[in-house]
Structure formats: C-alpha cells, structure tokens
Swiss-Prot record:
Cofactor(s) this protein cannot do without: Mg(2+); Mn(2+)
Protein name: D-alanine--D-alanine ligase
Top EC category: ligase
Role summary: Cell wall formation.
Keyword Disulfide bond: no
Pathways per UniProt: Cell wall biogenesis; peptidoglycan biosynthesis
Residues at which ATP binds: 162-217
InterPro entries xref list: ATP-grasp (IPR011761), ATP_grasp_subdomain_1 (IPR013815), D-Ala_lig_Van_CS (IPR000291), D_ala_D_ala (IPR005905), Dala_Dala_lig_C (IPR011095), Dala_Dala_lig_N (IPR011127), PreATP-grasp_dom_sf (IPR016185)
Cofactor note: Binds 2 magnesium or manganese ions per subunit.
Catalytic activity: 2 D-alanine + ATP = D-alanyl-D-alanine + ADP + phosphate + H(+)
Keyword terms of this UniProt record: ATP-binding, Cell shape, Cell wall biogenesis/degradation, Cytoplasm, Ligase, Magnesium, Manganese, Metal-binding, Nucleotide-binding, Peptidoglycan synthesis
One GO term describing the cellular component: cytosol
Length: 348
C-alpha cells in the first residue's frame, strides 16, 4: 500500500514562529511512518518558502528542522511549488499569517486538503475581539472587557476601562496567541504601558477584567460531528501563564482530567462544542476556560491551531481519551480530506 504524503508547513512570520518549530518537530516524530511519508517546508521570518527535510521513517531524537538561524536560501522555492496531487498539508503555524485564514486561503487556491479550520473560522478565532462578539451572540459567558483600537484617544480608553473594570486587568493583542504581548496591569500607569506594548504586536487591543480563576482547557475534534475531551487543567507556578512560562521555563504542569465537579465539566464541554459550531469551525480547536472561585465559568479563548509540542495540552487531552498522538494525526488528516471533498463538491 502506498503511503499518504503529509506536508508539514512550519515557521512563519509571526512572533509565535519558535512555537511552530517545536510543534512541527513533535508532529514529525509522532507520525505513523507505515502510513505516511512526510515532507517539510519552512516559512522564514521574512516570508520565503524553503524546501527542507523529507522523512520516510521516524527521525532520530537529534534530528532538527531548519530555523531562521540555520536557513539555507539556496533551497528557496515558489510558494505554489509545495503543491502535490493527493498530498495533505498540516499547517503547523501559529499566530498571524498562520492561523488567521491567510494560509488556509492560499491552500484552498492551490486546491490542497489541509488540517484545521477553514478561512472564516480561522480569521474569526484569530481576532480575540471578534471572537468575543460572536460568542456573546451564542450566549457563552466571558469575562468583562473593553477594547482599544490604534488611533483612538488613549486617555479616553483608560478612563472608560477604569470605569468599567477594576484592577488588575490583562491587556492582549487581539491577534496573537501563545501569550505573546500579554501584560498584567494594576494601575493606570501600568495599563498605559501595557497597551503601548501590545500595540507593537497588533493595532487591536483587548483589555480584560482579571479574575481569580483556574485555567481549564477542552480539546475539540471533528467536522460537522464535533467531539470534545474531558477538561484538563493548567496548574501554574507563576503569576500568569505567559510565553516564558509556557515554552521556556516550563513552569506549568497539566492535570488531566481536571479535578472539577461533574456539572462544570459538562458545561465546559457544551460551551466548547457550541463555540466551535458558532464560528463555523472544522478539524480541530482547543477551548480555554476560566473557572472562578465562585464556580462561574468563562470562555477565555478559542484556539484553532493549538500547540503540538510534547508538553502541549491538546494532544495530551486526546491521549487521555484513548487517541494517541499518531492516531490523532491520522484522524486530523482524514478530517482534512473530508472537508476538502465537501468544499470541492460545493463548487460544482
């Protein structure tokens, strides 16, 4: 039986490109090589597409993918050169120009099946402000927030935020993930500085009420028939779960399943599946919740391309449900092919 070609697209132009490399290396080691032949393509920080390694068997633990530090520009190709009939693309890309609909649109123009959510749901979920407004219309609870858009009166935003929220607040670029550019502010001075920092990553800024809460995550998998995992908890040894804690210091542990009561567990799974459908998602996502000390549940974020590193919550959640990493990849590929056939059918 011939092997299915799986193309890993990784790297990218966003500030989350280092996470993408870690995720892609984890995927390339988890693949079942009796069923797949893996090709990898690196997208550099400046946007070049570089042809990199190919694998017909599991790479060694010392094998590393190309990065911006080891780039070989003589291997640069045209973006459209990744096309291969029958291949499935796994865009292991995080953040802007990766999970915001850009790559998804490019792959649809190439007529290639790809793992993950479609153009619309990717772009909606990428923007935290838009996501909140869509989920509000679906009746899903969220923490109170205000918004600052670059060019607006900053002093007025500060005054409106102080009137609507209480310190501490968290300031986030609307179109970033992996906790990049997020700051905690406990005064007007810190809030101003946090907004200015976030503006270096995005022109749309979300300011959220800080809540004393546990961070609980639910994995989602499927197309029209979506399935959810039991919730898992991010147990932190830090003030908040920032990029440094997630990917460098690794100052977190995972509790799977989370030790929460059954009603909260059920509610989170229902909210997660509702959110997935509300944005028109397909393939996969991870829903991140806050569980307040009073038992109140808030949906914090919908992540359409969660991390796939060896310590990432998403694959661990599915492993607990009885779907190991290799089987998860195989199912994601199947879902990608299913959606591709459906999209193509709609164009006839």
């Amino acid at each position: 039986m011939s092997k299915q070609t799986l193309i890993l697209l990784y790297g990218g132009r966003s500030a989350e490109r280092e996470v993408s490399v870690l995720s892609a290396e984890s995927v390339m080691r988890a693949v079942d090589y009796t069923k797949f032949f893996v090709k990898t393509y690196f997208i550099s920080q400046t946007g070049q597409f570089i042809k990199t390694q190919e694998f017909s068997s599991r790479p060694t633990l010392t094998e590393r993918l190309m990065t911006n530090d080891t780039i070989r520009l003589e291997q640069q190709i045209r973006p459209s050169d990744i096309y291969e009939e029958g291949a499935v693309v796994f865009p292991v890309l995080h953040g802007p120009m990766g999970e915001d609909g850009s790559i998804q649109g490019f792959l649809e123009v190439l007529r290639m099946p790809y793992v993950g959510t479609n153009i619309l749901s990717s772009s909606v979920a990428m923007d935290k402000i838009t996501t909140k407004r869509v989920l509000e219309s679906a009746g899903i609870p969220q923490v109170a927030y205000t918004v600052y858009i670059e060019g607006q009166d900053l002093d007025r935003c500060l005054a409106e935020t102080e009137a609507a929220l209480s310190y501490p607040v968290f300031v986030k670029p609307a179109n970033m993930g992996s906790s990049v550019g997020i700051s905690k502010a406990e005064s007007e001075e810190e809030l101003r500085a946090a907004i200015l920092l976030a503006l270096t990553y995005d022109s749309r800024i979300l300011i959220e009420q800080g809540v004393l809460a546990r961070e609980i995550e639910v994995g989602l998998l499927g197309n029209t028939d979506v399935k959810s995992t039991l919730p898992g908890e991010v147990v932190k040894n830090v003030d908040f779960y920032d990029y440094q804690a997630k990917y460098i210091d690794n100052e977190i542990t995972m509790a799977i399943p989370a030790t929460i009561d059954e009603s909260a567990m059920t509610s989170m799974r229902i909210y997660a599946e509702t959110a997935f459908k509300a944005i028109g998602a397909c393939g996969l996502s991870r829903c991140d919740f806050f569980l307040g000390q009073d038992g109140q549940i808030y949906l914090n974020e919908l992540n359409t391309m969660p991390g796939f590193t060896q310590w990432s919550m998403y694959p661990l959640l599915w492993e607990h449900m009885g779907l190991n990493y290799a089987e998860l990849i195989e199912e994601l590929v199947r879902l990608a092919q299913e959606m591709f056939e459906k999209r193509e059918g709609h164009l006839i």
